[in-house]
A protein has these predicted regions:
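A glycine-rich, often tryptophan-bearing local segment used as a flexible ligand/cofactor-contacting loop or short
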Residues: 692, 705-753
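A short beta-strand element within beta-rich, extracytoplasmic domains
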Residues: 180-204
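Beta-strand-rich modules
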Residues: 544-565
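Active-site-adjacent mobile loop/cap segments within catalytic or ligand-binding domains
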Residues: 251, 257, 268-276, 351, ...
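Aromatic-Pro/Gly-enriched surface loop or interdomain linker
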Residues: 81, 96-104, 112, 281, ...
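Extracellular carbohydrate recognition and processing domains
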Residues: 217-246
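Active-site microenvironments of hydrolase-like enzyme catalytic domains
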Residues: 291-389, 421-444
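Pro/Thr/Ser/Gly-rich low-complexity, intrinsically disordered linker/stalk tracts
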Residues: 472-515, 549, 563-582
Length: 753
């Protein structure tokens, strides 16, 4: 079978024709339309007007680096208000921005480690430990190219693990029988979430749809990886929940089954982000890899030395800044967007974005705000395929304008912006595709970071950036777009017959985006100790399911449309006990997301982590330590005397947040009573009168860390008036109420409370 061109009618374009198109303002006919680098084929919803088949490079700023002049590992930016820019920007990019882009169908490369898992397990063909081949009709053999091999201990500067070993290959087979395979079955030191990275070698006859299957906590998720690109580095599949120990139920399998003739190759598979292992100045950083700069991740990912260290080992600070763009160019070289760069990996990356925060203070308690940066006057005259550098300025301008619009609409704050700088910055000069730096806010100005540490601010900021990328990409290719919906609300579960429950929810309207309307929903189910399945797409805002007796079922729901998928609802649970005649209702009233406790007087400013550490969306690793200096008179200073200065005792620690999955713990505890059925709902369904409490033998009200903290962007309260009214009515009719929470009394101090 003749191998298709990777890009539409462009890789064979002559130099003269390319030069003739110099300065174009859109990609025009340049569009990658073949198989994406990675595709999750278990995804239940189809994306047609999102970022499907778009390959993006997105990163958070800075990271721990080795300072050769001063002789030690250090942060690139100072510690202020409990964090540093090196830590803070990751808390926007990793939990919010990248998932939004991936939910829209994008394939996102990020040059810094994305996984907050400190453990790392590598299974490789060279070590053979936990690696098992099965050759059927087609036989496995060693490739002619070098591959990955791991050795014990740390790695010297410049040591490339992807040239130290071998890789394996087998001919692809179209028939779904007598399939050859490789099983990667690691031993996990503890139960948890682990990113999964695969590696392989790209060869002349590589297939564009290699079949990978990830087995995780009794579930399986299927991927197709285009091995015609991106060989010889780590390729991210996804992040999954795995059980402790060694089991086939927690493994990765690669087969040679493919709809295309050719070669399937395989090398090592990596589970988890791990600890930094690159030696500089005689020592490693001693921190998880996700806290280090991109320079060290690039080396671990097999990037060439001229990408890892432009300074030839003399200046890690500059190397870290440069390698983000250089690694993007290395991956994208030879694709339709960088057709003249022949020595690359042919990954069709077409856009880069660096998320930073900035310095600067305002003595009048106003905002410093957001700044965009682009480079149009320096670097190559045009970008890849003759694209004008001015398209980057358009991108930066749209990012800044839309951030202000979306933040103002959501929070009515009159957010500040600082226009767009067109200056010579490495992260916008070196990329050979459109690029921008977005300085989110000032980490030195407390009014900025006070909002910036609120998870709802981070979500809204990230959603604005995602929407700008979506619209920008649609315009660059002349396509229509649809904005992914917001998560459903008023989620509830009720019995509709003796052994059947109905899940029901409401769509959430996004008043600022008319296209962000759900047209379907994904319902995810986890039974007992198993992980969540890959979901079922349904058209209506409800779903009926029969329950097996004695098993706790856990559910979550997302909203979908042609543009992608929303974030999920909280996890709700249900249980059917054989012979049960009464039902308990668990009400989840714990939805709070907040920054730490705020200190803001005429003389002091900052975060008091001891009084209240705040609640992130899930776990977060963005804190350096407790703030020590609250003296407002020292605003804008540097060093220990500066306002905001603090410690580093929390560096590398992943701090728990609101996981929105505590109903399942209550359901599992109640299961042992053995004589009750269980259903659950969000507290808003009770407040709005959508749940008849009188049907239930007991209401278990889960408040968690819910409270009115006085500073959050959204209002939270243990017992809101509507909830109190419904519970009072229930109790007056001899209902039984069990309440748990950290602030159920202290949050009710009003005269009418």
């Amino acid at each position: 079978m003749k191998i298709r061109l990777l890009c539409t009618a462009l890789l064979a374009m002559s130099f003269a024709n390319t030069f003739a198109q110099s300065g174009k303002s859109t990609w025009g006919k340049t569009d990658y339309e073949d198989a994406p680098w990675v595709k999750n084929v278990s995804r239940p919803n189809e994306i047609t007007e999102g970022l499907q088949n778009r390959h993006l490079s997105v990163w958070s700023s800075h990271g721990r680096y080795y300072d050769a002049k001063k002789g030690g590992w250090r942060w690139q930016r100072p510690i202020l208000f409990g964090t540093t820019e090196d830590l803070y920007t990751q808390t926007i990019v990793l939990p919010y921005l990248i998932p939004m882009l991936e939910n829209a169908g994008a394939i996102v490369f990020t040059p810094r480690e994305r996984d907050w898992q400190k453990n790392e397990i590598i299974v490789d063909n060279d070590s053979r430990t936990n690696y098992k081949e099965e050759s059927m009709k087609k036989k496995w053999a060693t490739t002619s190219d070098k591959g990955f091999a791991q050795h014990y201990g740390s790695y010297n500067d410049g040591e490339n693990p992807f040239t130290a070993g071998t890789a394996r290959q087998v001919k692809a087979r179209k028939r779904n029988s007598k399939i050859s395979s490789v099983v990667y079955q690691p031993t996990f030191p503890e139960t948890g979430r682990y990113a999964v990275y695969v590696s392989y070698q790209t060869q002349k006859k590589s297939v564009e749809a290699a079949e990978y299957i990830v087995f995780h906590k009794g579930q399986e998720t299927h991927f197709r990886v285009n091995q015609r690109m991106g060989g010889g580095t780590w390729v991210y599949l996804g992040t999954f929940e795995f059980d402790k120990g060694n089991s086939i139920n927690n493994s990765v399998v690669l087969t040679n089954h493919s709809s295309h003739r050719g070669i399937v190759t395989t090398d090592a598979v990596r589970f988890g982000g791990g600890m930094g292992n690159i030696v500089r100045g005689g020592t490693v950083s001693g921190l998880p890899r996700f806290l280090e700069g991109a320079r060290y991740s690039a080396q671990w990912a097999g990037a060439p030395w001229n990408v890892v260290s432009k300074s030839n080992g003399s200046n890690d600070y500059n190397d870290d800044i440069n390698c983000r763009s250089l690694m993007t160019n290395w991956l994208a070289g030879g694709s339709c967007y960088l057709p003249e760069k022949k020595d690359g990996k042919k990954v069709p990356i077409e856009l880069t974005l660096a998320i930073h925060s900035d310095a600067g203070v305002k003595t009048d308690d106003s905002y410093v705000g957001t700044l965009g940066i682009c480079t149009t006057q320096d670097g190559n005259k045009t970008l890849g395929d003759g694209l004008s550098r001015k398209v980057s300025k358009t991108f930066a301008e749209q990012l800044v304008a839309n951030v202000k619009k979306d933040l103002d609409n959501a929070f009515h704050i009159n957010w500040a912006t600082r226009s767009v700088w067109d200056r010579n910055y490495s992260e916008t000069r070196l990329p050979e595709v459109p690029s921008a730096i977005l300085e989110t806010l000032s980490h030195q100005n407390f009014p900025d970071i006070k909002l910036g540490q609120d998870p709802n601010f981070k979500f809204t900021f990230a959603r604005s950036v995602y929407k700008t990328i979506l619209k920008y990409e649609a315009n660059m290719h002349g396509k229509t777009y649809t904005v992914q919906p917001l998560a459903p609300n008023n989620f509830k579960i009720e019995y509709v017959s003796a052994n059947k429950v109905r899940l029901q929810w409401r769509p959430t309207t996004d008043a600022s985006e008319p296209t962000a309307t759900p047209t379907s929903y994904n319902v995810y189910v986890a039974m007992g100790t198993r992980g969540f399945d890959n979901g079922m797409n349904v058209r209506n805002p409800y779903f009926d399911i029969e329950l097996l007796p004695g098993v706790v079922y856990n559910f979550k729901v997302t909203a979908c449309n042609r543009g992608g998928e929303s974030f999920p609802t909280e996890v709700l649970s249900a249980l059917r006990n054989e012979g049960a005649t009464q039902t308990i209702l668990i009400v989840n009233a714990f939805s709070r997301l907040s920054s730490p406790a705020v200190v803001n007087t005429s003389t002091e400013q900052g975060f008091d982590l001891e009084a209240d550490p705040g609640l992130s969306y899930g776990p977060v690793a963005g804190w350096a330590g407790r703030q020590a200096n609250f003296n407002k008179a020292m605003m804008g200073k540097e060093g220990p005397s500066a306002l905001g200065y603090g410690g580093e005792e929390l560096v590398g620690k992943v701090i728990a947040g609101n996981d929105f999955n505590y109903v399942k713990d209550h359901a599992e505890a109640l299961r042992h009573a053995g004589k009750y059925n269980i259903v659950s709902c969000n507290s808003k369904a009770v407040e709005y009168g959508e749940v008849n409490l009188s049907k239930y033998a007991m209401v278990d009200l889960l408040l968690g860390n819910e409270k009115d903290d006085g500073h959050s962007l959204y209002y939270y309260k243990t017992f809101k008036p509507a909830l109190r009214q419904q519970l009072t009515k229930y109790l007056n009719n001899r209902g039984k109420l069990f309440v748990s929470g950290s602030y159920l009394a202290s949050d009710m101090q009003g005269v009418d409370e």
